[in-house]
From Swiss-Prot:
GO terms for biological process: protein localization. Mediates the nuclear localization of RNR2 and RNR4, 2 subunits of the ribonucleotide reductase. The keyword Magnesium does not apply. This is Damage-regulated import facilitator 1.
Length: 131
């Protein structure tokens, strides 16, 4: 039996064996990553549940206070600074201005006006028809 395996392995070049092994390893890695991706939602839910279960009443009260929020943005992305949000007292910017707004824009008043029925005569094959 060993002689047959040696003879069979001598027929297949080493390069092909290496390529097959690499392809199998890549396929295993892809399968592993697919499995990880498919279970990410469940893992997130578990972590959230664990966070709610381990939270004590004092930490839940503290989590509602705005001073507890920590800014980790400079650690995650270096040289990142958070831009301040506008205050609620300022009005939002207008979507249109004088240059983009047409004075002859359609309005509901123009739509409510009933136009008289279009009555005119047309010529079809030399005979008059009334529409």
């Amino acid at each position: 039996m060993d002689a047959q395996l040696e003879w069979a392995s001598s027929l297949v070049p080493k390069r092909q064996l290496q390529q097959q092994q690499q392809q199998e390893q890549q396929q295993q890695q892809q399968d592993f990553h697919k499995d990880q991706l498919m279970t990410v939602g469940m893992r997130i839910r578990q972590r959230v549940d664990q966070g709610y279960a381990s939270r004590t009443p004092s930490t839940s009260d503290a989590s509602l206070q705005p001073g507890v929020i920590r800014d980790y943005s400079s650690v995650i992305v270096p040289q990142f600074t958070r831009s301040p949000l506008p205050t609620a007292n300022s009005l939002p910017p207008m979507l249109i201005n004088q240059r983009t707004m047409s004075t002859e824009a359609s309005s509901l008043e123009k739509w409510d006006v009933a136009e008289p029925a279009a009555e005119h005569e047309t010529m079809v094959n030399g005979s008059k028809r009334r529409l």
